[in-house]
Amino acid sequence: TTLFRSDHALKAQDAFEKELIAYNRQIVEEGNKKQKLIILLAGRPYHSDPLVQHKISNMISAMGVYVITDDIVRHQDIPLKEVNFLAQWAFTNRILKSAKWAAQQGNHVQYMQLTSFGCGPDAFLIDEIRTLLKQYNKNLTLLKIDDVSNTGSIKLRVRSLVESLHISLQQAEERQVQKPLSLPLFTKKDRKKKIIAPFFTPFISPLIPSIFKVAGYEMETLPISDECSCDWGLKYSNNEVCYPATLIVGDIVKAFKEGRYDPDNTCVAITQTGGQCRASNYISLIKKALIENGYTHTPILSIAFGSGIDNQQPGFKVNWLKVLPIALAAVLYSDCIAKFYYAAVVREKKPGQAAKLKDMYLEAAKPLILKNRPEDLLSYLSLAVDEFNQICQQKSCPKVGVVGEIFLKFNPFAQKDITTWLIDRGIEVIPPLMTDFFMQSFVNMKVNQDSHIKKKYIPDFAIDWLYGKVQKQIDKINKIGKAFLHFQPFENIYEKAEKAKQVISLNTQFGEGWLIAGEMSSFASQGINHVISLQPFGCIANHIVEKGIEKRIKSVYPQINILSLDFDSSVSDVNITNRLLLFVDNIK
């Protein structure tokens, strides 16, 4: 039977792993006995292939060095409390544990790691390993390998390393373990401190401080990123990490470097959604940057919307029953203002009218949020409908939908403000919505439970009841918004999910998950056939759920025209503009 075969396979796998562990331990015992140099060669599972790793392990052993792998720590309980890293990938956890194991051994045991260019979590994993080894006065040797056939430089590095290690063994000095630096926890006494948070979007970011005030905290949103943010971010985060992380780290470091905030009386907040995306480790990157700059008295708050996020903050307490209704209303309100603004700005009778109304209504929302009056926000939307109608000319405009990674598609600086570029050419931008990002959770919960990926700890009727409460508010917004002449209503998230199912499995929930497919399908079904997808360069998750679905989505919607743009801190303005010009030529 299948069950018997699975059980047999698992037992065989377990026996194989035990054999690997035993063989590695045997090599270590022999090396220890002879006090010979031992190198722990760590890497991805595929680096065990001699072809992929260019026989580096053979090369090292031919020099009289004992070579072991990270399998030495399999099934060992090695705590990683001092590491700023979200332990959610099995192989990265093993690599970290092997680095700590090697660090704790004598000087004759050294650590070497193989990495392939652009390999996901390595962007922050390598920094953590380097810091970990440094605490034990050991160095990280990192070999970047790819498919090149010329391995001369690698051989030279390996030979040089082995020779230098042999020399250092003869001059071995007593090592002193350094105590790892860490940031304090957010405790009850920190509740009165000012909290700063990175800028996200021109629509919801201005309202976040008011929402936090309702929760009992004083928060300020940092200014939108600039070139200075890029410079600080590149200096204090790994240059191969995704672009949003560079900007977020840079914004926070810049705020303290410019003296706008006292690090001893300030806390940093960052939202986290969990999941396989590298964004789950943003909090670790921020902690590392603060420690490197000496801001060791600044606690970090994780505002988590997903599971698997572990950040101890015993003093952070929120009455969510009090805050969630006004927070939901604020998100819907800001999304609705975004719909009004983007439809009106290409039709405004006088330049600047739409921007003026947008700013006015976002500012008007702040006192209503402070008073915790969600219904009053709806009343203001009714007023906004009339005013946005008055500034619009009656004309038809070509439309472009914007999708992509959440930070890129919402943040003007990160995307080089391409929405304004399109508006200046008379193209109506159909904006991304925060509402959909949160509403997809209802679909994901049901899909995960029905697929037996997660246990059914929430009954369907409870999910449906909560969804109904939220959908009721969305229906109210749609009812008010339809009075605006160019309003496109909020779509039912389950209907969007059904469209996405034609393209991709709803179990695909990493990165933006199935939402990109759903948004593209929704645009195409509404006759919006031109879509721009914005991604950070090297964003593995979104490359799969966006670029990976293009062929399929074009087979379902042959008329759709997709432009994928990748961004990082060094992307060429000219390259982006040229691609946009070619894209626009197909619209008009």
Label the predicted regions.
Residues 1-588:
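An N-terminal assembly and electron-transfer interface module characteristic of large anaerobic redox
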